[in-house]
Amino acid sequence: MHSLRFFSNAEVAERLAYPQLIEALRIGLAKPCSAPLRNCHALPAQASLLQMPVWQAGAGIGVKLVTVFPGNGARGLPAVAAVFALFDGEDGRPLALLEASELTARRTACSSALAADYLARDDARRLLVVGCGTLAAHMVRAHACVRDYRHIDIWGRDPAKAAALAARLREEGYPARA
């Protein structure tokens, strides 16, 4: 019997470790895949719906669905919400539905770290992260998997946010400073 699995952002974070994701991307990105241009549909109130399909022969089929509601900030809600649907590549059965915020942040950070692993000098010991948003901490955690950074500098337009992020990262054991 087949049952569709659901993974919350917390479950994605728990199960999707940075080192393993970097290695999965190293293997997966080396293989051809089909990733048509995303579809973007205009919704009322200047909102949008985006569809981003991807599939790889012999593997799965996925589609990320994203809504963008710019007015949500006034409601205390995130402007962007997303899910990722995974289907079996052999028979098309739905396998899983994942909240996509954590998935996207980790995939983006790990893709960046993978690129740095190929492009940065092996003896690189300093990392600069520009920005203090959601992605910044993920960038530090992922990049620290590919290099032994001795200095991690955080820069942001708001010095207080940069300092707070650096402090949080130091609590996690990273040599971060604003």
Regions found by a protein language model. Name each.
Residues 102-103, 133-135, 142, 157-161:
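Short acidic/polar capping segments at secondary-structure boundaries
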Residues 145-172:
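NAD(P)-binding Rossmann-fold cofactor-contacting core
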Residues 107-127, 134-146:
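Short internal alpha-helix immediately C-terminal to a glycine-rich phosphate-binding loop
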Residues 1-105, 113, 123:
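N-terminal ligand-binding/catalytic initiation module
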Residues 172-178:
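Short acidic low-complexity segments
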Residues 129-130, 155:
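Structural motif
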